[in-house]
A protein has these predicted regions:
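Conserved short beta-strand elements that form part of the metal-binding/catalytic scaffold
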Residues: 27-59, 105-110
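A structural feature recognizing the 12-helix transmembrane core of secondary solute carriers
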Residues: 36-39, 71, 84
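N-terminal first-folded block
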Residues: 7-40
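N-terminal beta-strand motif that seeds the catalytic metal site of vicinal oxygen chelate
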Residues: 1-19, 44-45, 60-62, 111-112
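Helix N-cap motif at beta-to-alpha junctions
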Residues: 14-15, 67-70
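Short amphipathic alpha-helices within nucleic acid-binding modules
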Residues: 21, 70-75
Length: 112
């Protein structure tokens, strides 16, 4: 697969409650962080629970790894999608959020 799904994010208002729910529901290792929690699903795709983000806080996003975040945003726009935010550089890579023509939010990710 040339552009694999590599990460997911669950947005919420109550990170403690959300951590407890997903940890117990799916037997995931959920480690508390200053902004929520990192999820290690024991062999699956890693993710995070966070209270950071936009309104509404309740959302789920999967991230697709791309070679060039800006180029992927341009391609999405040419296909009828919309840039929501980004590209945003962070210490371990660059990400963006786009929406497809139906309004679904998708994350784009390029590691350093």
């Amino acid at each position: 697969m040339p552009n694999p799904v590599v990460f997911f994010e669950i947005g919420c208002k109550d990170t403690a409650q959300t951590r407890e729910f997903y940890g117990k529901m799916f037997d995931w290792n959920v480690a508390e962080t200053p902004t929520g929690a990192m999820i290690d699903p024991k062999g699956g795709i890693p993710g995070q629970i966070t209270s950071l983000g936009h309104e509404p806080h309740q959302y789920t996003i999967f991230y697709v790894q791309v070679d060039d975040v800006a180029a992927a945003i341009s391609q999405a726009e040419s296909l009828g999608g919309t840039k929501i935010v980004g590209p945003i550089p962070i210490p371990i890579g660059t990400f963006a959020w786009i929406s497809d023509p139906g309004g679904n939010t998708i994350g784009l990710w390029k590691p350093k």
